[in-house]
Amino acid sequence: MTTVLITGIEPFESDPTNPSWDIARALDGERIDGATLVARQLPCVFGRANRELVAAIEATQPSLVLALGLASGRSELSVERVAINVIDARIPDNAGNQPVDVPVVADGPAAYFSSLPIKAIVHALRAAGVPAAVSQSAGTYNCNHLFYGLMHHIATRAPRMRGGFIHVPATPELAARHPGRPSLRLDAQIAGMRVAVRTALATQGDLRLSGGTLH
């Protein structure tokens, strides 16, 4: 049986919800093209988040891992290209930790690329009417920390597994707490994630399309 692990993150920075977990939870138990989706919530706590991610991988033995996180301020599903080996926390995590300029993994490589077909996913999302783009930076907070931890685990312990990270926008209800922030309806985000999973399962390579930026 093929398993897809999809993770979301608990709420942080005073927000009552986190759409990344709302999406993952909505997809838990669904079957897409013969694969079963299994959802896990991860904490917004440095170190612990990656330990719980590895535990979830070991418990579920997925062939594909799709890690999700909130990027409040973005207006589209952002399929991340690269994870970097640094934590530079602008705000404390949910346990009060605020590491600055420390590596995610001591002596780890500077960066890892996603092993998802990022451009194929963006192309499929746009074709389905869901706003999406390739993102060149997952930031330096917990999302990048999780993304790097996932790719390090794949590189060192699970080379046949594929995985990557997608940042999701705020929902309208969440954006209303922060006037001026863009949003995307939760049902559209859930539908988009189904497209992302289906595309990742069906695509081993990637499309040769421009997804870069000028700055």
Swiss-Prot record:
Top-rank lineage group of the source organism: Bacteria
Residues of the active site: E80, C143, H167
Cellular localisation: Cytoplasm
Single GO MF annotation: pyroglutamyl-peptidase activity
Catalysed reactions listed for this entry: Release of an N-terminal pyroglutamyl group from a polypeptide, the second amino acid generally not being Pro
UniProt keyword list: Cytoplasm, Hydrolase, Plasmid, Protease, Thiol protease
EC number: 3.4.19.3
Coiled coil: none
GO cellular component, one term: cytosol
Enzyme class: hydrolase
GO biological process: proteolysis
NCBIfam families to which the protein is assigned, alphabetical: PRK13197.1, pyro_pdase
Family according to the record: Belongs to the peptidase C15 family.
Function: Removes 5-oxoproline from various penultimate amino acid residues except L-proline.
Protein name: Pyrrolidone-carboxylate peptidase 2
Organism: Ralstonia nicotianae (strain ATCC BAA-1114 / GMI1000)
Record lineage: Bacteria, Pseudomonadati, Pseudomonadota, Betaproteobacteria, Burkholderiales
Gene: pcp2
